[in-house]
């Protein structure tokens, strides 16, 4: 009898050996995965099946999901940029609103890059980095929130309304406009605000405004002729012809501070009864008070780096640190040292306290030159415009003088105001020195200062007729 030999045993041993090899390979792969997961990912085939692949995919998927739900913590600057703090511009494709469109014109006047030319991003040090962008709509910056904001005309609907008649919607809209506007003010009617003894234009003469030669980095802008102040003014005429409106459809129309002053609404009873913000005078306090503006009157500040800045300092605003660059007006310190001997010097600015107070702490740390400081919260907000009502000082207005580059800032006490030319970078400027003799004379006369200021500067003659 012949017996058949079964060949299953070798196959079984071979299978066992295969299973042993696969187990070893499996453990080896798990060890290699623990030691070098990146290398293991490269060795794995593009499509895996089985329990190990499922576990890996589950781990990878949960990690990515966790990253998406809990992103890495960003720096303050990056987080603020995402929240659109420094730029209130709508994203590309959104139609810019009218107040934002006006900012482009003003930026050109003050020598800054226009909003249509660059899109600014934040660096880690709080500076702005210009990146070319041809499709970005106009932008507004933080300047309008910590620095002095720009004045805007009253709307035709509420031009003749009182400051107390604003509806909540109008008040909110006005505040939003102020927040959107830039800090740097246009040199409005420099002929009227000059203090070098030059004659002011008569009410019947046409007024022209041009960009001053000392404005940094600006191109010559065409002159715009303003109708005579004796001509009747209506909201429809708006001080501009139809041709001018077509040419400057998206630009900022020329701002007439005296038209603004003429139509400013009266103060409300609540505003008139505000408590004085300053302490009572002491025996050592000079009898006369001199109120000084800050931005473009004594200094020029910018968030953009200025190569000729006299000093720089950081400002913490809404959890973000910004670097402020400061230029000092020529004869700034000499003027303050001489005037502080005969006047009670009071700084009154429409800027935020977080910026202005820190700057004054650097310039006058012991308060030897400036006795008191008033900020935006001490101004009167009239339909979105900050006006400096001198009644809040608690001082005798017959012995109080205010110097400001914006006449509309002292609209309620026009006879107490001395206009001065806006300053940005002119190193040959002497406007502060030119005021010294007149200010000294007012103290020597020891009379009501208002008639002398009115006769010298004749600001009332610049007001449009009724």
Swiss-Prot record:
List where Polar residues composition bias occurs.
46-62
The record ties this protein, via Pfam families, to: NIF
Keyword Lyase in annotation: no
Sorted keywords for this record are:
Hydrolase, Protein phosphatase
Q: Which InterPro entries match?
A: Dullard_phosphatase, FCP1_dom, HAD-like_sf, HAD_sf, TIM50
Q: What is its EC number?
A: 3.1.3.-
Which regions span the lipid bilayer? none
Q: Which residues form the FCP1 homology domain?
A: 283-442
One GO term in the molecular function aspect is: phosphoprotein phosphatase activity
Q: Hydrolase: present as a keyword of the record?
A: yes
| Residue numbers spanned by region Disordered | 1-111, 192-242
- Show the ranges annotated as biased composition (Acidic residues): 30-39
Q: Where is the composition biased (Basic and acidic residues)?
A: 63-82
- The cysteines joined by S-S bonds are none
Protein purpose: Probable phosphatase.
Q: Which family does it belong to?
A: Belongs to the CTDSPL2 family.
Recorded hits in NCBIfam families, A to Z, give: HIF-SF_euk
Q: What is this protein called?
A: CTD small phosphatase-like protein 2-B
